[in-house]
Amino acid sequence: MGTANDKAARSAPSATRRADIVAAARALYEERGLSKTSVQDITDRVGVTRSLFYHYFPDKEAVTSAVLDDYVADFIEATHYWNAQRRTGDIEHALSSVVKLMRLGVFEHDAFRRSLASRENAALYIDFVNRVADRIATYIVETTVQDYSARHRVRIDHVYETFYVLILGIVGYLRTHPDADDEALKDLIVQTLHMDRGRPETDDTE
């Protein structure tokens, strides 16, 4: 049977309680790192029992996955902001600002990001990056690519897949080459996407 504390806690809306646990886990991961945070630490921070934690999450891995979803949502929110700030027809500005966005995403330094970068958590890091690539590629195909195609020809097939691979490649390259030149990164994006950096096309001529 559950304790009185458990019953009181369960009276809170389920989604809110779950969000509280995820927020506590994220805060602790950022403060201490993944390996130094236990389920007990998380429940102590929220003020609930372990049995209530396990009502929402089967294990620490499950709540960590939810924390990753939070980070992905942050990155998507930043991408939405980037897209909203783009200047119509100004490809150079879009390239410069998206490179800055990618750098911020890769090099935000908190304990959890450092934990993800460790060999111990390599599989978790790959999962995180793949989630980011999927969500951002989907969003860009549905928004930015549509805007671009109104002014230029889209010269790539498999558009979603190309963006997915490009995002993975840029993130991986920046992690191993943090001093990479921004102009080189912009060139890589343009070459991969076969973008037209010149004037908008007005007909079907090459």
Regions found by a protein language model. Give the residues of each.
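N-terminal intrinsically disordered/low-complexity leader segments
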Residues: 1-16, 201-206
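Short hydrophobic clusters on alpha-helical segments that form packing/core surfaces
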Residues: 17, 21-29, 71, 167
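Helix-turn-helix
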Residues: 20, 28-62, 66
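Alpha-helical DNA-contacting segments of helix-turn-helix folds
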Residues: 64-71, 128
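Hydrophobic alpha-helical connector segments
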Residues: 66, 77-107, 159-163, 186, ...
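Amphipathic alpha-helical packing segments from all-alpha helical-bundle domains
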Residues: 76-77, 122-149, 153, 157-161, ...
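Amphipathic alpha-helical segments used for helix-helix packing
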Residues: 94-97, 101-127, 172-176
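Hydrophobic alpha-helical segments that form the core
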Residues: 101-103, 153-176, 180-194
